[in-house]
């Protein structure tokens, strides 16, 4: 499930390093975390929706790859991201 354009803009604004920053790993992780949270809520109602569950696993995998990249580049940014978004690792 996607997120509304207004919500996505809000997430980008709160996670951006500078104005107009939409591609940094921090912003991408924030957007993916929002989409993952939406899908998790969706699965509480629609437990047998296995097609969307596959999409969720792809999102989680993509987020993990981005987090691995951030961890490799800067451990402090990585830990801040985990804490900010409440990601267990």
From Swiss-Prot:
GO terms for cellular component: cytosolic small ribosomal subunit. HAMAP family: Ribosomal_uS15_B. It comes from Nitrobacter winogradskyi (strain ATCC 25391 / DSM 10237 / CIP 104748 / NCIMB 11846 / Nb-255). SMART domains: Ribosomal_S15. Belongs to the universal ribosomal protein uS15 family. One of the primary rRNA binding proteins, it binds directly to 16S rRNA where it helps nucleate assembly of the platform of the 30S subunit by binding and bridging several RNA helices of the 16S rRNA. Forms an intersubunit bridge (bridge B4) with the 23S rRNA of the 50S subunit in the ribosome. InterPro entries: Ribosomal_uS15, Ribosomal_uS15_bac-type, uS15_NS1_RNA-bd_sf. Residues 1-25 are annotated as: Disordered. Part of the 30S ribosomal subunit. Forms a bridge to the 50S subunit in the 70S ribosome, contacting the 23S rRNA. GO terms for biological process: translation. This is Small ribosomal subunit protein uS15.
